């Protein structure tokens, strides 16, 4: 989950410059970035991909996450658009040759689900001959710590997705889900009253995770049972789970 979240927070903001006409090439770096970000805010991932160099490199700190090439970047962009990102620039946009730098507040639906309105991050982007060649996101240390805390707890299960929700495949030996009465073959159909049918890809796992020691209410259909039941589980540190 954490890696997902790292990609989700790392790829867009709004600059507010004029869009680059398709006939202009190479465009100024700040205009290329603006076109990229406007397209991404509309969910137009294809336009975003067209503005990436074939050997584009994405890096995020302090996690050390690194993506190389268009394919992994495209995958992360398609995930990002499902969370309706909103960005607010909080510093002057600095342009030095082919490099652009700025700071922004990032707000996304996934952050709000976790209970965080936004994170602060610095961006360093290189544009070469009209294509984005490198993208570095440096998340504010305090915000990164908070994100880590908000996703540090879990219920100790391995899962697979089915039409009705999330089926339990395996439970950790010290799983709090097992202690609460959940067994292999059970299906989680809702989290804290939110139905699986209303969720986006990855949202159920996100809602199940949370700070260590907090409680999550799961609606569970036991294998072979006709009706679901609500079960409350206390999250434990993911690091202490043993499979």
Where are these regions (language model features)?
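A short gly/proline-enriched turn/hairpin at secondary-structure junctions
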Residues: 51, 57-68
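PDZ/PDZ-like groove recognition
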Residues: 151-177, 181-184
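PDZ-domain C-terminal substructure recognizer with occasional recognition of PDZ-binding tails
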Residues: 164-167, 189, 203-243
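Low-complexity, intrinsically disordered terminal/linker segments enriched in charged
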Residues: 133-152
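Bacterial N-terminal signal peptides
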Residues: 7-16
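Conserved PDZ fold ligand-binding element
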Residues: 177-200
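Surface-exposed, charged secondary-structure patches
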Residues: 71-116, 124
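Short, low-complexity N-terminal intrinsically disordered segments enriched in polar/charged residues
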Residues: 17-42, 46, 50
């Amino acid at each position: 989950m954490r890696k997902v979240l790292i990609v989700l927070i790392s790829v867009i903001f709004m600059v507010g410059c004029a869009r680059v006409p398709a006939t202009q090439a190479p465009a100024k770096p700040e205009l290329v970035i603006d076109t990229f970000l406007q397209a991404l805010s509309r969910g137009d991932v294809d336009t975003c991909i067209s503005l990436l160099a074939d050997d584009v490199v994405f890096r995020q700190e302090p996690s050390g996450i690194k993506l190389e090439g268009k394919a992994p970047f495209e995958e992360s962009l398609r995930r990002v658009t499902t969370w309706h990102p909103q960005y607010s620039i909080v510093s002057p946009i600095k342009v030095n040759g082919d490099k652009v730098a700025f700071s922004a507040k990032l707000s996304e639906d996934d952050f709000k689900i976790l209970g965080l309105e936004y994170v602060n991050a610095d961006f360093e982007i290189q544009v070469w001959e009209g294509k984005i060649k490198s993208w570095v996101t440096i998340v504010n240390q305090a915000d990164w710590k908070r994100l880590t805390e908000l996703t540090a707890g879990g219920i100790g299960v391995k899962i697979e997705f089915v039409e009705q929700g999330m089926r339990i495949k395996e439970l950790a030996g010290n799983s709090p889900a097992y202690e609460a009465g959940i067994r292999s073959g059970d299906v989680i159909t809702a989290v804290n009253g939110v139905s699986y049918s209303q969720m986006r890809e990855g949202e159920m796992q996100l809602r199940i995770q949370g700070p260590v020691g907090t409680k999550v209410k799961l609606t569970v259909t036991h294998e072979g049972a006709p009706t679901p039941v609500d079960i409350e589980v206390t999250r434990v540190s993911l690091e202490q789970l043993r499979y």
